[in-house]
Regions:
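A glycine/serine/threonine-rich, flexible loop-to-helix segment
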Residues: 176, 189-223
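Short, small/polar-rich loop/turn modules that mediate ligand/substrate recognition or access, typified
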Residues: 175, 180, 250-252
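Conserved glycine-rich cofactor-binding loop
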Residues: 7, 14-16
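Short C-terminal tail/terminal secondary-structure segment
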Residues: 97, 228, 240, 251-264
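Alpha-helical segment proximal to the catalytic Tyr-Lys
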Residues: 128, 172-173, 248
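Catalytic loop of short-chain dehydrogenase/reductase
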Residues: 92-93, 139-162, 167-176, 185-193
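Catalytic Tyr-X3-Lys loop
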Residues: 101-121, 135, 139, 163
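Conserved mid-core segment of classical short-chain dehydrogenase/reductases
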Residues: 70, 91-109, 132, 152-155, ...
Length: 264
């Protein structure tokens, strides 16, 4: 098993990506600790893991609340001897598709503050334990907006580019202590549209051009080298690999899972 007996904390554990990653982590032998704001979504994710024989615990924790995150991570570390993997899969619905003249400061800052604050808070909480124990893996999730240009992307672009820069800098800081940091950059995830905030967000963007959401998503797929969008299980499987010892020389990297929308 890739993650046998690893202690993995997943913030945003009730969301589409967090729950999918948790399922794979548990299958690969990790003891999974899901944290998020929605108890029903956390319970649903945990139920699926338990049905497959996996080990999982849940906690209602707002990743914007540094004290709450610290208390939860510290409690997990005390009870289980440390933190091996920390994944931030927290998501924020936000405005895309509008020109800067039509975008309010609040709408611009919402994803920037949300993603950068929660990743700082969760990484800091985990790093404290990982550096003390001499190893661990911190996983972050970006978007193609970090590399794209064009109308309607300023908030998304700022948060994604900022998160990728944060991840690289953190990898440099924590590397001497044996801690790896890997950022994963997927594209729009087709099978997450029906279960996450992205469905409504993509619908709003499509509506700006009077395009049905399904057609808009098909257009996104057509702009990739593989002529398709990535899927949740592909991202989850990669996250498990990146968290495992098989990727022990990988750090400071942004893994491109855009199906070829971005060519690095």
């Amino acid at each position: 098993m890739l993650l046998e007996d690893k202690v993995a904390v997943i913030h945003g554990g009730g969301g589409s990506v967090g729950a999918a990653a948790a399922q794979v982590f548990a299958r690969e032998g990790a003891r999974v600790f899901l944290a998020g704001r929605s108890l029903p979504r956390l319970e649903a994710a945990a139920s699926s893991i338990r049905a497959g024989g996996g080990s999982v615990e849940i906690a209602v924790v707002d990743a914007m609340d540094q004290d709450a995150v610290d208390r939860h991570v510290d409690a997990v570390a005390r009870a289980h001897g440390g933190i091996d993997v920390a994944l931030n899969a927290v998501g924020f619905d936000h405005v895309q598709g509008l020109a800067i003249g039509d975008t309010s400061l609040a709408d611009y800052l919402h994803p920037v503050t949300g993603y950068l604050q929660t990743n700082f808070v969760t990484a800091k909480a985990a790093a404290r334990h990982m550096t003390a124990q001499g190893g661990g893996v911190i996983l972050t999730i970006s978007t193609p907006g970090a590399r794209l240009t064009g109308r309607g992307l300023i908030g998304n672009a700022a948060q994604s580019a900022g998160l990728e820069g944060f991840s690289r800098a953190l990898a440099g800081e924590l590397g001497p202590a044996g801690v790896r940091v890997v950022c994963v950059r997927p594209n729009a995830l087709l099978d997450a549209v029906g279960t996450s905030y992205t469905g409504e967000m993509f619908g709003r963007i499509a509506a700006l051009t009077a395009t049905p959401r399904a057609d808009w998503l098909a257009g996104l797929a057509g702009n990739t080298l593989l002529d398709r969008l990535p899927l949740l299980d592909e991202v989850a499987e990669y996250l498990a690999f990146a968290a495992s010892d098989r990727a022990r020389s990988m750090t400071g990297v942004v893994a491109n899972l855009t199906a070829g929308m971005i060519v690095d």
